[in-house]
Amino acid sequence: DIRLVMNDTKLTPNSGPAGGSRSQVMSGNACRLAAENLLAAMRKADGTYRNYEEMKSEGIETKVKGNWVATYCADHPVDQATSQGEPFSVYMYTLFLPEVAVDTMTGKVKVEKFTVVTDVGTIMNKLVVDGNFYGGLAQGIGLALSEDFEDLSKHTSLLRCGIPYILDVPDDLELHYIETYRPEGPYGAAGCGEAPLDAPHPAILNAIYNATGARITRIPAKPEVVLEALKAL
């Protein structure tokens, strides 16, 4: 049996937060190395593998304790004054193409379709990646058009804060994957958490501009905000 220990710094080193879309790269590489160490111990000279009893009888360790390992220090220069540069070794790249309908009489915006083209490296688990993007698109629609947490005296629940309803999310969501191998990711994978959360909302604002010529510079782009921008044209 394999028992996975998580979030216990008594047994596993603290590797930092799950930020910067680093979880798959960090945890994935750690899991890969652990599995490779285990397989190396199990492998026989003829290419077959020992079972647990055989390993015990031959005095082969059945438990491998990991250690802090640094094979090299990568050169990723960053300008501390401007934060420009390459602070990470693995990145994701995504194009968001929303199609919106704008009611110029009321200012109401409806996202009718969302097409996504993304390169997140080797896809390890497509259902998980799909879930990241579908969830991120729904959040992006809410962030762009309805979610407002500024007035907490008024918005006393998630519902009243403008979380999108299921009818606000289009059925027509297209995800297209390009798999470019990342040498420093586990089996060529990159992260996939930040792209679907960071970029859908500005893409929606750009779609409103493309449809109407009205440039929205603040979110959420509620009907009154869109109507104000339309009247200013």
Which role fits each region the language model picked out?
Residues 186-205:
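C-terminal structured "cap/appendage" subdomains that terminate the fold
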Residues 3-5, 167-189:
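Generic long, charged, amphipathic alpha-helical segments
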Residues 4, 114-116, 175, 221:
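Hydrophobic/anchoring residues in structured secondary elements
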Residues 7-137, 143, 148-168, 225-233:
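Cofactor-centric catalytic regions
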